[in-house]
């Protein structure tokens, strides 16, 4: 059977691409090397922060606002509570470029934010210990997504829509020819008019020249009492340390607060090198300095997990067709901040499959910037 679209990699972005393409009436085949939602990619670990006033630059704001609207729409259609608006506090030095970008994004797109000095931070969230030169930009309408539930919901929706599913089936090659594009798997070869590659960390196994580097990362849950819960109005957070290293975290649930270090990690070249949490000495200690200085009331590490980032050289996304074949689109290089965008990126991919342009400017994410 020939398909209108084959999606390679059916995690967060891939499942969304399959969903929106099938909603548009396309004949879609979704392929994944595992059985999503799974632990092998970048969508596990229960939650992901949803920020609107974007510290990585205002070019992301139209995309993230579209993603938020689509997440809300999906939640309404399925009855699943995918997003929790607990608010997000962005903390950092008063000269932080990241916070300047947050403020600039909010101003340009008229997003509701509140800027607080260190005294106001301590008054509003007394569990935070902050230096005198720190400020916060609080986003009351932001929060977090339930990432595993979100992927599970998308997979269920595409299955009910009659989308072709080929899971636990690695892809070995993409072959272009005049009549279409062949996707070679261990189960056979499948053909499509268009192909979208959303293969996450291991995309270079299919596209070896793509400028993406896999990095092993970890996050962990720590003992935290009710002061750190949503019931006590404790928000999700990003914190920039004085050395510019960024940490992130979530309100405690069941007395466990999840947090991680955005920077750092271990360069890896294969899935076998993505060792479980605890296999590196720093896994259990890399957040200690942050906790000691900013959240000293948070307790011992209860558990942790490993994941992986697909890092681009500039940590901005790659959303483009391949120079050698414009019938193949790649969405990659999400660099540890991509999950929140999954619905919008999936919509962009589905529009590509219909020969329709993205209504949102994605030119900043083209491969041309690396040439």
Curated annotation (Swiss-Prot):
Keywords in alphabetical order, please: FAD, Flavoprotein, Oxidoreductase
Question: Where is the PTM S-8alpha-FAD cysteine found along the chain?
Answer: 307
Q: Which GO terms describe its molecular function?
A: flavin adenine dinucleotide binding; N-methyl-L-amino-acid oxidase activity; sarcosine oxidase activity
The UniProt entry's GO CC annotations, sorted and at most eight, read: cytosol
Cofactor comment text: Binds 1 FAD per subunit.
- Could you say which cofactors this protein requires? FAD
The UniProt annotation places FAD binding at 4-34
Q: What is its EC number?
A: 1.5.3.-
**What domain of life does the native source organism fall in?**
Bacteria
Class of this enzyme? oxidoreductase
Q: Which Pfam families match?
A: DAO (PF01266)
Q: InterPro entries under this entry?
A: FAD-dep_OxRdtase (IPR006076), FAD/NAD-bd_sf (IPR036188), Me_Trp_Oxase_MTOX (IPR023493), MTOX (IPR045170)
Q: Which SUPFAM superfamilies match?
A: FAD-linked reductases, C-terminal domain (SSF54373), FAD/NAD(P)-binding domain (SSF51905)
From the UniProt record, list the reaction(s) this protein catalyses.
N(alpha)-methyl-L-tryptophan + O2 + H2O = L-tryptophan + formaldehyde + H2O2
Q: Which NCBIfam families match?
A: PRK11259.1
| Protein purpose | Catalyzes the oxidative demethylation of N-methyl-L-tryptophan.
Q: Which family does it belong to?
A: Belongs to the MSOX/MTOX family. MTOX subfamily.
Q: What does the annotation say about its assembly with partners? A: Monomer.
Protein's name according to its UniProt entry? N-methyl-L-tryptophan oxidase
Record the organism: Yersinia pestis
Top-level taxonomy? Bacteria, Pseudomonadati, Pseudomonadota, Gammaproteobacteria, Enterobacterales
């Amino acid at each position: 059977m020939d398909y209108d679209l084959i999606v390679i990699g059916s995690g967060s972005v891939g499942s969304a691409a399959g969903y929106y393409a099938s909603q548009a009436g396309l004949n879609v085949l979704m392929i994944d090397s595992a059985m999503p939602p799974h632990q092998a990619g970048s969508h596990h670990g229960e939650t992901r922060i949803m920020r609107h006033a974007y510290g990585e630059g205002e070019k992301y704001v139209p995309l993230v606002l579209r993603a938020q609207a689509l997440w809300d729409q999906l939640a309404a259609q399925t009855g699943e509570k995918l997003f929790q608006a607990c608010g997000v506090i962005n903390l950092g030095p008063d000269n932080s470029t990241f916070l300047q970008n947050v403020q600039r994004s909010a101003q340009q797109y008229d997003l509701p934010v509140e800027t607080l000095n260190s005294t106001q931070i301590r008054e509003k969230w007394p569990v935070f210990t902050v230096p005198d030169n720190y400020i916060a930009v609080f986003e009351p309408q932001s929060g977090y997504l339930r990432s595993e539930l979100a992927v599970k919901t998308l997979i269920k929706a595409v299955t009910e829509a009659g989308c072709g599913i080929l899971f636990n089936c690695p892809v070995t090659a993409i072959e272009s020819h005049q009549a279409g594009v062949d996707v070679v798997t261990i189960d056979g070869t499948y053909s499509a008019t268009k192909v979208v590659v959303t293969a996450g960390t291991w995309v270079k196994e299919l596209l070896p020249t793509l400028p993406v580097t896999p990095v092993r990362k970890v996050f962990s849950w720590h003992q935290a009492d009710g002061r750190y819960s949503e019931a006590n109005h404790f928000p999700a957070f990003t914190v920039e340390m004085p050395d510019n290293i960024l940490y992130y975290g979530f309100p405690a649930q069941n007395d466990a607060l999840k947090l991680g270090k955005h920077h750092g990690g271990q360069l890896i070249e294969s899935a076998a090198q993505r060792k479980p949490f605890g296999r590196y000495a720093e896994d259990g200690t890399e957040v200690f300095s942050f906790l000691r200085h900013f959240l000293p009331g948070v307790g011992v590490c209860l558990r942790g997990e490993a994941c992986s980032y697909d890092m681009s050289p500039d940590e901005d996304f790659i959303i483009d067709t391949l120079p050698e074949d414009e019938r193949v689109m790649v969405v990659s290089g999400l660099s540890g901040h991509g999950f929140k965008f999954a619905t919008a990126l999936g919509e962009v991919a589905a529009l590509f499959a219909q020969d329709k342009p993205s209504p949102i400017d994605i030119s900043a994410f083209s491969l041309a910037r690396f040439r």
